């Protein structure tokens, strides 16, 4: 409380003070003062609680000058130790693991990796789901350690760059269209079978088709006819013995039949030719073919 008194004094003159003195009170009193103190006390309590929560959060989250917990900030980017769970999409230029450990990506639903262009459109996608792995791109390629293409797929063709393509399934390999390859070979001590259940099987090559069995036999079975046709060359059966075990045996017919009969003749070099049959052999008469 402040009191102000106005008194005029002159040297040598005494002036009596007035009986009524005016007192002016400046400040906050009563319930307003109590509310102000209560508000200040509440601010102090909130400040202390905030400071305590800040210290607790810093301690729980493992904040340090290098980063937060297992997440460290380096000059090359962010380094994350241990296992982490991302609840929202992760955008990064490069993700790699430590030198002494592998990189593991897992999810309860699927793992999707997208590549986008400058306009935000998806240009490539790799989706690993519970039932299949889906790749969406113009070309899919697998390379070896030295950069050699091992497997390439695009809209036009599938290229296998390995030295050998091995199919181990019990049903083999099923091709709906043509297959182009320089060699078809079975595993050692296993049979090689080429089959077309409902259509024909064709093997074409501009410089010849070579079929060889080193330790077994080659068998061709057909319900209908088996035809060997050579337009410009000849058919060669190169073997010590040529057997035709199921040839139909002829029967005696009426004499003087007009039906033309021929006999098979063999040249010294193995060439076969037909000769008109007679009472005796006529091969000698047509042996000019062997010359």
UniProtKB/Swiss-Prot annotation:
InterPro entries cross-referenced by the UniProt entry: Sarcoglycan (IPR006875), Sarcoglycan_gamma/delta/zeta (IPR039972)
Tissue: Expressed in skeletal and heart muscle.
Transmembrane segments: 38-58
One family name in Pfam for this protein: Sarcoglycan_1
Keyword Transmembrane helix set for record: yes
Localisation: Cell membrane, Sarcolemma; Cytoplasm, Cytoskeleton
S-S pairs: 265-290, 267-283
Keyword terms: Cell membrane, Cytoplasm, Cytoskeleton, Disease variant, Disulfide bond, Glycoprotein, Limb-girdle muscular dystrophy, Membrane, Signal-anchor, Transmembrane, Transmembrane helix
Main location: membrane
GO biological process: cardiac muscle tissue development; gene expression; heart contraction; muscle organ development
Side of membrane Cytoplasmic, spans: 1-37
PANTHER family xrefs: GAMMA-SARCOGLYCAN, SARCOGLYCAN
Disease: Muscular dystrophy, limb-girdle, autosomal recessive 5: An autosomal recessive degenerative myopathy characterized by rapidly progressive muscle wasting from early childhood with loss of independent ambulation around age 12 years, dystrophic pattern on muscle biopsy, absence of gamma-sarcoglycan and normal dystrophin immunostaining.
Function recorded in the entry: Component of the sarcoglycan complex, a subcomplex of the dystrophin-glycoprotein complex which forms a link between the F-actin cytoskeleton and the extracellular matrix.
Similarity comment: family membership: Belongs to the sarcoglycan beta/delta/gamma/zeta family.
Name this protein carries in UniProt: Gamma-sarcoglycan
Organism of origin: Homo sapiens
């Amino acid at each position: 409380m402040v009191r102000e008194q106005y008194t005029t004094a002159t040297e040598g003159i005494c002036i009596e003070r007035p009986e009524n003195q005016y007192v002016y009170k400046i400040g906050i009193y009563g319930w307003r003062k109590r509310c102000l103190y209560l508000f200040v006390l509440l601010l102090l309590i909130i400040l202390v609680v905030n400071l305590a929560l800040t210290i607790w959060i810093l301690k729980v989250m493992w904040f340090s000058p290098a980063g937060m917990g297992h997440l460290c900030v380096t000059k090359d980017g962010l380094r994350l130790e241990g296992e982490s769970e991302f609840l929202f999409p992760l955008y990064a230029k490069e993700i790699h693991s430590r030198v002494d450990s592998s990189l593991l990506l897992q999810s309860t639903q699927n793992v999707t990796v997208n590549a986008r262009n400058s306009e935000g459109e998806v240009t490539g996608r790799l989706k690993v789901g519970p039932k299949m792995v889906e790749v969406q791109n113009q070309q899919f390629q697998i390379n070896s350690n030295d950069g050699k293409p091992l497997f390439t797929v695009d809209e036009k063709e599938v290229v296998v760059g390995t030295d050998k393509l091995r199919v181990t399934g019990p049903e083999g390999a099923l091709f709906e269209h043509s297959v182009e390859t320089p060699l078809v070979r079975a595993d050692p001590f296993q049979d090689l079978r080429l089959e077309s259940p409902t259509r024909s099987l064709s093997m074409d090559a501009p410089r010849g088709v070579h079929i060889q069995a080193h330790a077994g036999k080659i068998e061709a079975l057909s319900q209908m006819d088996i035809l060997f046709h050579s337009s410009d060359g000849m058919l060669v059966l190169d073997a010590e013995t040529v057997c035709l075990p199921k040839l139909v045996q002829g029967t005696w017919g009426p004499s003087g039949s007009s039906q033309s009969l021929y006999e098979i003749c063999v040249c010294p070099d193995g060439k076969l030719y037909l000769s008109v049959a007679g009472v005796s052999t006529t091969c000698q008469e047509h042996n000019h073919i062997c010359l």
